């Protein structure tokens, strides 16, 4: 993401078959590890878990999220968390947008045609981070370090 505009690099979904929970969590961990190894991000933004009407679903979502966070933490990546409302506010301008509105705005902001709702949600979370004070401050620090490196290489 540049200072003025977000740019699309890649997106996708880690799909896990109807395996035992431990195998699904392992697949998520390994999938996120592969993405980190391939793209070398310098930070990660994730959506906070919300309490759903189904407690079992919320617990499983929390476990899957934990597997993804540990995969990133193993690479010493800073992890930023945002609520669904914060993400919707940053992308659509109001905190109660629906999935179609999020998907439409992500496609417009990044000039992509992301038809997978889960991938669009992940991209929305990344764009949200870029639009927040933490995201802007982290980018400024990173650009400052890169500038110092470039000057020292001269």
Task: Label the model's feature ranges.
Residues 1-154:
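Phosphate- and other anionic-substrate recognition elements at nucleic-acid/protein interfaces
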């Amino acid at each position: 993401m540049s200072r003025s505009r977000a740019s699309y690099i890649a997106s996708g979904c880690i799909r896990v078959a109807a395996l035992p929970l431990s195998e699904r969590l392992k697949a998520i961990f390994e999938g996120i590890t592969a993405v980190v190894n391939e793209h070398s991000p310098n930070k990660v933004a994730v959506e906070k878990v919300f309490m759903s009407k189904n407690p079992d679903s919320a617990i499983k979502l929390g476990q899957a999220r934990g597997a993804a966070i540990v995969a990133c933490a193993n690479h010493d990546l800073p992890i930023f968390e945002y609520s669904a409302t914060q993400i919707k506010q940053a992308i659509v301008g109001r905190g109660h947008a629906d999935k179609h509105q999020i998907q439409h705005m992500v496609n417009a902001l990044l000039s992509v045609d992301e038809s997978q709702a889960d991938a669009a949600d992940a991209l929305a979370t990344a764009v949200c981070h870029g639009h927040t004070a933490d995201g802007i401050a982290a980018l400024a620090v990173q650009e400052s370090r890169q500038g110092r490196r470039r000057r020292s290489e001269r």
